[in-house]
Amino acid sequence: MKILKSFTPRILVIGDLMIDHYLWGNCERISPEAPVQIVDISKETTVLGGGGNVVNNLVALGAKVSVSGVIGNDENGVELLKLLREIDVNVDNIVIQEGRKTSKKSRVIAASQQILRYDKESKEEISKSSIEVILNSLAKDISRYDAVVLSDYSKGVLTKELCQGVISTCSKNGIKVLVDPKGSDYSKYSGAYLLTPNKKEAIQATKIDIKDKQSLKEALLKMKKDANLAISLITLSEDGVAIYDDEMKIFPTVAKEVFDVTGAGDTVIASIAFAISAGKSIEESAKFANLAAGVVVGKIGSATVSISEIEEYEASLHKSTSDAHIKGFEEIEAIVKRYKESGKKVVFTNGCFDILHVGHVKYLQIAKSFGDVLIVGLNSDTSVTRLKGPSRPVNIAEDRAYLLAALEAVDFVVPFEDDTPYELIKMIKPDTLVKGGDYEGKSVIGTEFAQELKLVDFVDGKSTTKTIQKIKGDLHV
């Protein structure tokens, strides 16, 4: 990973460039004109899509990226160039073709659900003159690149003539070509270093129903032979990545939580291209891509991932289960954002949990039942001392957090230094705030930031104080 972090590969992306346009709003009415929903738009966002998302991923990893493709002489084309320049991408080799529409996909989203998509684009093959310009530019600048990525979304840019021209030029100059393919005819990519279809795409292209390791191997071999590849590769979603060079190897997925698989394929080809350019083997590159995909599917939408995020993620995989669920303020803020964006209901409670007992466990189980994710705020040692006296806590915060995080009902534990979790609740803004039944009729800190307050009765006769008394022999039962 250190070598990858210190290396800046120069990568050219050629393919279908597009804009992903999102319109966010609320839908609470039906139109009087027709039986359709009315969406009141409150926010609009635009990001790079298609091959542009591969570019985004490469830039996030730290690559120096150039882009080649064809756009129209239109407003969307101007916007796309602006988005690329904003992330410091070389756009000198993008061709503007008269009469062609720049691809823009607009999605209307309400209540976290996509309810409509409309597209503006051209799908016909690009002109002969556009192909010549791209190939001439590649031949002139080939020494500037460590690898070339072809990102095919079947929008007419990556014709067979262009693909074969690119692969031929790169082959003569010792440059590897990696392809994210589309369609069932992989012959147009013949001679590439590798392709990265997903399982569904591989089945479509090879006509082999991949249902076990033997059929997977057959599909990999057929791809390798039919497209004259150095290496064949198939992404297997939650099962990881399979490759075939001289034998089949499967690298299992390492994703801990999956929020959204949108754009995961772009992350895979970008990370493999990045690692291959740094001189890594295909095995090392596949493992790196798996880690990158494991991070990106934990985000919402066509997201990207950095080397630092991958390093942190890899380190977290080696932590114990409990350690991985103990978070700081910044970490939990990002985690809560992802859960809420995916429509999950967040529950929060807090306490000292000094000597964990059955009353605590049952309380936390009930709290978890109010939503999808339970976050427990944990008073620090100094906070417990201020609240409970100089003899407390019995167990230090590190031990208390570890025990809580090991409980099935608890998703995350967040230690805090203040006497109350006010700032933590303010940041999280839980759907449900849970407190003990002894708060009946009392003011509860942070209720103004929660959608609802739930009071849960304690288990009779179970408390940390009584446990301590019993240990001391002061309580006879």
Curated annotation (Swiss-Prot):
Stretch list, region Ribokinase: 1-321
Keywords assigned: ATP-binding, Carbohydrate metabolism, Kinase, Multifunctional enzyme, Nucleotide-binding, Nucleotidyltransferase, Transferase
Record-linked InterPro entries: Bifunc_HldE, Cyt_trans-like, PfkB_dom, RfaE_dom_I, RfaE_dom_II, Ribokinase-like, Rossmann-like_a/b/a_fold
GO molecular function, one term: ATP binding
Positions that bind ATP: 198-201
Top-rank taxon: Bacteria
Region: Cytidylyltransferase, residue numbers: 348-477
This protein's GO CC annotations: cytosol
Enzyme class name: transferase
Biological pathway: Nucleotide-sugar biosynthesis; ADP-L-glycero-beta-D-manno-heptose biosynthesis; ADP-L-glycero-beta-D-manno-heptose from D-glycero-beta-D-manno-heptose 7-phosphate: step 1/4; Nucleotide-sugar biosynthesis; ADP-L-glycero-beta-D-manno-heptose biosynthesis; ADP-L-glycero-beta-D-manno-heptose from D-glycero-beta-D-manno-heptose 7-phosphate: step 3/4
The keyword Nucleotide-binding is assigned to this record: yes
Pfam family, one: CTP_transf_like
EC number annotated for this UniProt entry: 2.7.1.167, 2.7.7.70
GO biological process: ADP-L-glycero-beta-D-manno-heptose biosynthetic process
Active site location: 266
Reaction equation(s) it catalyzes: D-glycero-beta-D-manno-heptose 7-phosphate + ATP = D-glycero-beta-D-manno-heptose 1,7-bisphosphate + ADP + H(+); D-glycero-beta-D-manno-heptose 1-phosphate + ATP + H(+) = ADP-D-glycero-beta-D-manno-heptose + diphosphate
Stated family: In the N-terminal section; belongs to the carbohydrate kinase PfkB family. In the C-terminal section; belongs to the cytidylyltransferase family.
NCBIfam families: cyt_tran_rel (TIGR00125), rfaE_dom_I (TIGR02198), rfaE_dom_II (TIGR02199)
Subunit record text: Homodimer.
Role played: Catalyzes the ADP transfer from ATP to D-glycero-beta-D-manno-heptose 1-phosphate, yielding ADP-D-glycero-beta-D-manno-heptose.
Protein name in UniProt: Bifunctional protein HldE
Organism: Sulfurimonas denitrificans (strain ATCC 33889 / DSM 1251) (Thiomicrospira denitrificans (strain ATCC 33889 / DSM 1251))
Gene that produces this protein: hldE
